[in-house]
From Swiss-Prot:
(R)-lipoyl-5'-AMP binds at residues 107, 151, 161, 179. Lipoyl amidotransferase that catalyzes the transfer of lipoyl moieties from lipoyl-protein H of the glycine cleavage system (lipoyl-GCSH) to E2 subunits of the pyruvate dehydrogenase complex (PDCE2). Unable to catalyze the transfer of octanoyl from octanoyl-GCSH to PDCE2. In vitro, it is also able to catalyze the transfer of the lipoyl group from lipoyl-AMP to the specific lysine residue of lipoyl domains of lipoate-dependent enzymes but this reaction may not be physiologically relevant. Its EC number is 2.3.1.200, 2.3.1.-. One of its GO terms (molecular function) is lipoyltransferase activity. Belongs to the LplA family. It comes from Mus musculus (Mouse). It catalyses: (R)-lipoyl-5'-AMP + L-lysyl-[lipoyl-carrier protein] = N(6)-[(R)-lipoyl]-L-lysyl-[lipoyl-carrier protein] + AMP + 2 H(+); N(6)-[(R)-lipoyl]-L-lysyl-[glycine-cleavage complex H protein] + L-lysyl-[lipoyl-carrier protein] = L-lysyl-[glycine-cleavage complex H protein] + N(6)-[(R)-lipoyl]-L-lysyl-[lipoyl-carrier protein]. This is Lipoyl amidotransferase LIPT1, mitochondrial. Its main location: mitochondrion. Residues 1-25 form a transit peptide. Pfam families: LplA-B_cat. Gene3D superfamilies: Bira Bifunctional Protein, Domain 2, CO dehydrogenase flavoprotein, C-terminal domain. The lineage of its organism: Eukaryota, Metazoa, Chordata, Craniata, Vertebrata.
Length: 373
């Protein structure tokens, strides 16, 4: 049963003293089940961290249920250029987010359920949570063959991944979050999580591709609503908490003081891209020239999402040496992103007005460079 939250007392009991009073109408004594009314990935990720930072979880575990509009969420230590097809995502309006926990890249949409289990650090147990999900699935469909793995995934029929795991462990609090594939767009999932970019070298955490399947493909009655209700019921029974699913708005600043600041941080270029571990780009591409093609070499060091060193080498007869050197020096310090490259290109073109032949080469070159961003 879903009930809307009226939060004026409960968080007063759950929150640490540094947080202004805000909370639920009926204070829980053992724990809570929450469900977000937002489909915004940044708001939901921010709410996770708000709970982690502000709620006293001793004896009061929390289950948070949430879904997002199409988005890709990468782990804290990942490289988005290695993990995603950023060009496709920009075209399709698929958001990119970097979470505070580790692990690999995942695709979210309204057919993918996200489950976050909040506990104290001492009560943190990923396998227990996964077994709880398995019991919930078997309660609605006893014929399902779903098993947890040593890597804390859930496999359907011993081969199809339906859930992946990540976690964050703090000084006293911890959370384990995982996905549950119900009716996600598997075409969008596959294409979004397939990087087309070549020549990137990095020590960032790589994702491990897996064969996936939707639970709805196995049984048409296993809708997101059915699965969320089943997990909530099993969680309530296991933890002996109130089975009501409390609806919350994670963007409500009056209810969750400081949440908007967390949302803005997660949306920022500095967090999403700037937190990428240092990497290099070492690649070549070809440009048309008379009846043939010329090879252009590109080498860049990228740190904190910005170009630290740049060496673009083109044949002198195609691009004059001094122009190439100007391009290299102009890139240093700029963001490794297509928007900034476009702005930089326009600025540089104004330094040599009227040279249409050079302009066309410059456009071709910068378009190729944007293609690796």
């Amino acid at each position: 049963m879903l009930i809307p939250l009226s939060m004026k007392n409960c968080f007063r009991l759950l929150c640490q003293h540094k947080v202004p009073a805000a909370g639920f109408k009926s204070p829980p004594t053992h724990g809570l089940i929450l469900q977000s009314i937002s489909n915004d990935v940044y708001e939901n990720l921010a709410f996770e961290d708000w709970i982690h930072d502000h709620i006293h979880l001793e004896g009061k575990p929390i289950l948070f249920l949430w879904r997002n509009s199409p988005s890709v969420v990468i782990g804290r230590h990942q490289n988005p250029w290695q993990e995603c097809n950023l060009h496709l995502m920009r075209q399709e309006g698929i958001k990119l987010a970097r979470r505070k926990s580790g692990g690999g890249a995942v695709y979210h949409d309204m057919g993918n359920i996200n489950l976050t289990f909040f506990t104290t650090k001492t009560k943190y147990d990923r396998m227990e949570n996964l077994k709880l999900i398995v019991r919930a699935l078997n309660a609605v469909q006893p014929q399902l063959d779903v098993q947890p793995t040593k890597k804390f995934d859930l496999l359907l029929d011993g081969q199809f991944k339906i859930s992946g795991t990540a976690s964050k462990i703090g000084r006293t609090a911890a959370y384990h979050h995982c996905t549950l594939l119900c009716s996600t767009n598997r075409t969008a999932l596959s294409s979004s999580l397939k990087s087309p970019y070549c020549g990137i070298k990095s020590n960032a955490t790589p994702s491990i591709p897996s064969a996936v399947k939707n639970l709805l493909e196995r049984d048409s009655t296993l809708t997101c609503e059915v699965l969320m209700s089943a997990v909530a019921a099993e969680y309530a029974a296991h933890h002996q908490v109130d089975g009501h699913v409390n609806l919350i708005n994670p963007a409500d600043e009056t209810m969750f003081p400081g949440i908007n600041r967390k949302v803005k941080e997660l949306q920022s270029w500095e967090w999403v891209y700037g937190r990428t571990p240092k990497f290099t780009v070492d690649t070549t591409f070809h440009v048309p020239y008379e009846q043939a093609h010329l090879e252009i070499q590109v080498f860049m060091d990228v740190k904190n999402g910005r170009i630290e060193t740049c060496a673009i080498k083109a044949p002198d007869h195609w691009l004059p040496l001094e122009i190439g050197e100007k391009l290299n020096s102009s890139f240093i310090g700029s963001k490794f992103c297509p928007v900034e490259t476009t702005l930089l290109t326009n600025v540089l073109l104004r330094t040599c007005p009227g040279d249409h032949h050079l302009h066309s080469k410059w456009y071709i070159l910068c378009e190729k460079i944007r293609g690796i961003m």
